[in-house]
Swiss-Prot record:
GO terms for biological process, alphabetical: L-arabinose catabolic process to xylulose 5-phosphate
Organism taxonomic ancestry: Bacteria, Pseudomonadati, Pseudomonadota, Gammaproteobacteria, Aeromonadales
Enzyme class: isomerase
Cited InterPro entries: Ara_Isoase_C, AraA_central, AraA_N, AraA_N_sf, Fuc/Ara_isomerase_C, Fucose_isomerase_N/cen_sf, Lara_isomerase
Protein name (record): L-arabinose isomerase
């Protein structure tokens, strides 16, 4: 995610000329101090760039226009140091097409009780200046985030950092290219969707690329590059005897390395952020790309199996959000249940393609037979996810809108080993429990594929949905089926009448 180092958030401080030159100078000085401190000490993922103080309609509008056209600016953070009449902000807010955060803070932490005079009161007016700005945001029906807190407090820093990560994911989404190697799995419904509407809504450029074009790139990979990658495998994974030098499946591992290098080159050369494969279209490919997909996900690419481009794109989005955070993010599928009384669990996995960023221990690299796809036994990494909090997220096309469904999870350690299971996995209890969680997921129409993450939580995804203007449904410990049904019906009416 090297591109994140080039991105920035613009900081615009609102005031007006009513208070005079001396007050405006203090406003500018305070804004610079806050900017410097946030950049140097807050641990934010993106750089803050202070813009000139917004004191007139024309000044503020010019900043918004520049923000829209900037290739580095992913969002705008505003602060009303003094009172800044909100009618001055109407043109800017009406045209701004980047995420917006209102930082409701003030320069001084404590009131100087014995020293307060009207000069102090005129300078430090965020308490009511922020409310004036907030009214205009509400009046214009703007999706926006409000962070309330002192600018040196860790809690405020964490909220700003969260918003920055989501804004960066929106920026990435607007430019995202998704390569589809083959089509969707035949006759599957939920992996379909309106690609034109997806580009309008999210920016996704989803296009088909013949598998034969990929095969040409794979076949051109050099022996030296393959051997170097095999050396890397031997360094970072535990290899089974079957794939070690001289092992029965060493040649299959060699082909898997060739696949990874070829696929990565294709994606890099084309500027793709996500991709899909399907076991029904492997013409010219030696084996189903399992290991390659796993490792490319760990490098930040979005992936979807069976042509699932919506999940691939969403996975890329969560990879961007979670960059540098503890915990991993992976393509996932609800595979089978454990229905023990009082301990109902879901075993999540896929045929091969689970990202090792969620591995609790050093993965095992192996080659085993796969009874689907009718190709040679494929390479794969074997591991399980660590216990802890997680989410499953599913993006679906409802015809007149996109819906993002999120379920909070409690991931648990495997109670027993799975010596015959030849794929990576995670074991979890959905919130509030399997009975309600699964029923709610099904009623919402969420897919059998999902994005599983232990790096970001549901609030990241709620804010992302707000920024993108799509429907959001959360299944958590407070969910009840009657209330969820009502929410679905209310949303249906809203999107038919208001969108």
């Amino acid at each position: 995610m090297e591109f994140l180092k080039q991105l920035e958030v613009w900081f615009v401080v609102g005031s007006q000329h009513l208070y005079g030159a001396e007050t405006l100078k203090q406003v500018a000085d305070h804004a610079q101090t806050i900017t410097n401190q946030l950049n140097e000490k807050a641990g934010l993922p993106l750089k803050i760039v202070l813009k000139p103080t917004g004191t007139t309609l024309d000044e503020i509008s010019a900043i918004a226009r520049d923000a829209n056209h900037s290739e580095q600016c992913v969002g705008v953070m505003v602060w009303m140091h003094t009172f800044s009449p909100a009618k001055m902000w109407i043109p800017a807010l009406s045209q701004l097409n980047k995420p917006l955060l209102q930082f409701h803070t003030q320069f001084n932490k404590d009131l100087p009780w014995g020293e307060i005079d009207m000069d102090f009161m005129n300078l430090n007016q965020t308490a009511h200046g922020g409310r004036e700005f907030g009214f205009m945001g509400a009046r214009l029906r703007l999706p926006r985030t409000v962070v309330v807190g002192y600018w040196e407090d860790k809690g405020a820093h964490e909220k700003i950092a969260r918003w920055m990560r989501i804004a960066a994911a929106v920026y990435d989404s607007r430019k995202m290219k998704v390569a589809r190697f083959g089509d969707n799995m035949r006759n599957v419904a939920v992996t379909e969707g309106d690609k034109v509407e997806a580009q309008i809504q999210f920016g996704y450029q989803v296009n088909y690329h013949p598998v034969g074009d990929l095969v040409k790139v794979i076949n051109d990979v050099s022996t030296g590059d393959i051997n170097a990658l095999l050396d890397e495998y031997e360094t970072i994974y535990t290899l089974t005897d079957a794939v070690k030098m001289g092992g029965a499946y060493r040649e299959s591992l060699y082909e898997a390395a060739r696949q990874e290098l070829g696929m990565k080159k294709f994606l890099q050369d084309g500027g793709f952020g996500a991709f899909t494969t399907t076991f029904e279209d492997l013409y010219g490919i030696h084996q189903l790309p399992g290991l390659a997909c796993q490792r490319l996900m760990q490098q930040g690419y979005g992936f979807g199996g069976e042509g699932d481009w919506k999940t691939a794109a969403l996975l890329r989005t969560l990879k961007v959000m979670g960059t540098g955070l503890p915990g991993g993010t992976s393509f996932m599928e609800d595979y089978t249940y454990h229905l023990e009384d009082g301990n109902n669990l879901v075993l999540g996995a896929h045929m091969l393609e689970v990202c090792p960023s969620i591995a609790s221990k050093k993965p095992v690299l192996d080659v085993q037979r796969l009874g689907i796809g009718q190709k040679a036994p494929p390479a794969r990494l074997l591991f399980s996810a660590p216990a802890g909090k997680a989410v499953n997220a599913s993006l679906i096309d409802m015809g007149n809108r996109f819906r993002l469904v999120v379920n909070n999870l409690d991931v648990v350690d495997l109670p027993q080993s799975l010596p015959k299971l030849p794929v990576a996995c995670a074991l979890w209890e959905p919130k509030p429990n399997l009975e309600v969680g699964a029923e709610a997921w099904i009623l919402a129409g969420a897919a059998h594929h999902s994005v599983f993450s232990q790096a970001v939580d549901a609030e990241y995804l709620r804010t992302f949905a707000e920024m993108m203007g799509i429907e959001f449904l959360l299944i958590d410990e407070n969910t009840t089926i009657p209330e969820l049904k009502k929410e679905i019906l209310w949303n249906e009416v809203y999107y038919k009448l208001c969108k």
